[in-house]
Amino acid sequence: MGSTEQATSRVRGAARTSAQLFEAACSVIPGGVNSPVRAFTAVGGTPRFITEAHGCWLIDADGNRYVDLVCSWGPMILGHAHPAVVEAVAKAAARGLSFGAPTPAETQLAGEIIGRVAPVERIRLVNSGTEATMSAVRLARGFTGRAKIVKFSGCYHGHVDALLADAGSGVATLGLCDDPQRPASPRSQSSRGLPSSPGVTGAAAADTIVLPYNDIDAVQQTFARFGEQIAAVITEASPGNMGVVPPGPGFNAALRAITAEHGALLILDEVMTGFRVSRSGWYGIDPVPADLFAFGKVMSGGMPAAAFGGRAEVMQRLAPLGPVYQAGTLSGNPVAVAAGLATLRAADDAVYTALDANADRLAGLLSEALTDAVVPHQISRAGNMLSVFFGETPVTDFASARASQTWRYPAFFHAMLDAGVYPPCSAFEAWFVSAALDDAAFGRIANALPAAARAAAQERPA
């Protein structure tokens, strides 16, 4: 029995109730989950069914407690069930769950975002990051009168058809980019968008140009050929959906210059980085003035809410002021808005200092344990987000991320889970810390890591 199977079998007894719940879920929900990565497909074993969470601790249906290093895939910077957020949500819910009409809090949340990200002059609230990027792309096309969109291999912008081409996140985790019928696109050459999922038609992705990430030469060549047809370039401000792979120095600024030269828009997707890596998101680290931004996760406080915004000149093309249609029955939901406002207002300088310090501490523990076990690795960072890539080669794009030794990750993951630490269940997902991590949590992480590192060291490629 290999170390992955051993790790999985050790936790199976401790996850008996979760296993029963998963079996029941599979009878009514495709794959037993409502978002594919949660199924543990990449690592094997039984998904943990979480019943409650407080601070930095998750509690599953079997009563097991885990240090949370996923944070609901990013939003929970304050930790779970933060008193200020819970109180705000309870008060909002007591006044009514949804009105289908404007509310004062919507304007307050929009103002909070505008006050943090200088290029954003107008905001439209939506319900998910997918809606935010989908709407931003539609608006860019409507504003410019052009059709083509440039995106980057490994960047994930939700599951909107036009952007689900060579995407990261769950698409990478499930290997949907690995279809042998898909032609490879050589570095520094543009490729026509090829759908990453059945059900996405070739026509839907035909106006999507996919380029290798961090390759500004490929961008310049593409604009030289298609510049008058390109409506926008969309990129994660700092990608976290092929693992954490930050932009090279000046990459986003170069995108800004090239798009401006050709009359195209730049869309920075800050759904993941926004208000997590700094008070102003990635813009606070690398202040590139994009035309449009997409936000989600932290600004929702963990509720279903997101937003897109940007220059007033562009945003005023949206209905009801302009002809570009976008709408949503539950957009600006008062309970979700209350959670977002409470989170942003509670996230003071001390919170961001704690997030950075906790990420530093976690990265140090990871590297120390893996070095001691003689496991080749890279700890890739973007502010307080990080990823562990196994291998000697630095990861700078999707190709190098996929070339890393991902076969080591399942054993590493299960050894951590077995010891009461909950890391991301895919090598292509980011690790997230909260400000609620304390010495007890770090003690558990430190105790778990040596065995996890040894498990990774013992793995061999299939």
UniProtKB/Swiss-Prot annotation:
One Gene Ontology MF term? glutamate-1-semialdehyde 2,1-aminomutase activity
Q: Where is this region: Disordered?
A: 178-200
Its pathway is: Porphyrin-containing compound metabolism; protoporphyrin-IX biosynthesis; 5-aminolevulinate from L-glutamyl-tRNA(Glu): step 2/2
> What Gene3D superfamilies does its record include?
Aspartate Aminotransferase, domain 1, Type I PLP-dependent aspartate aminotransferase-like (Major domain)
EC class (word): isomerase
Q: What is its EC number?
A: 5.4.3.8
Q: Which InterPro entries match?
A: 4pyrrol_synth_GluAld_NH2Trfase, Aminotrans_3, Aminotrans_3_PPA_site, PyrdxlP-dep_Trfase, PyrdxlP-dep_Trfase_major, PyrdxlP-dep_Trfase_small
Low complexity composition-biased segments: 182-192
GO biological process, alphabetically ordered: protoporphyrinogen IX biosynthetic process
Where is it located?
Cytoplasm
Has keyword tRNA-binding?
no
Recorded family membership: Belongs to the class-III pyridoxal-phosphate-dependent aminotransferase family. HemL subfamily.
- The name on file for this protein is Glutamate-1-semialdehyde 2,1-aminomutase
Gene symbol here is: hemL
